[in-house]
């Protein structure tokens, strides 16, 4: 018996995939399984309403927001640092961008030192994308100079990540904590149809939801 089961549902349009999945998910919920779904197309709105779940739709006025940097000391591990590194790289490089080994190591170092500054040295006021961005803008040039690194496009880093910093067009996305009441819900649907064609927001929001 495993608690990490997986399956894949494939079929042409109109073949009943959503109908089947509604049935499967309902049965799982009835067996006391907590359900969190990411959907495009409003396929599970009716089921969510039926079971009294929480249905959250992404809109420009009310984007889905989370603060992936707000973690406890015991939650800081290789997996979490890797997740945050992928998040930063997604904003900086996009889904198709090439990441060099130097850039990968650089961002990993900055993230690690950022948390050290907060947990060990108490030099950072709070954990958020805002404070990470502020810290990285100062620390990255220092690391580049200390190690004589070349080929780091610091201007593009500062420019692209600024969209998610305070005052930017997506300033709420990575800085506002998820409603803690959601942790008490047993059935949650995140509807992100409105950003399914956005090459940055769609993978980014999906990534932070799954975290």
Language model features by range: what are they?
Residues 1-60:
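Glycine-rich phosphate-binding loop of nucleotide-binding enzymes
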Residues 1, 42-54, 60-211:
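P-loop NTPase motor domains
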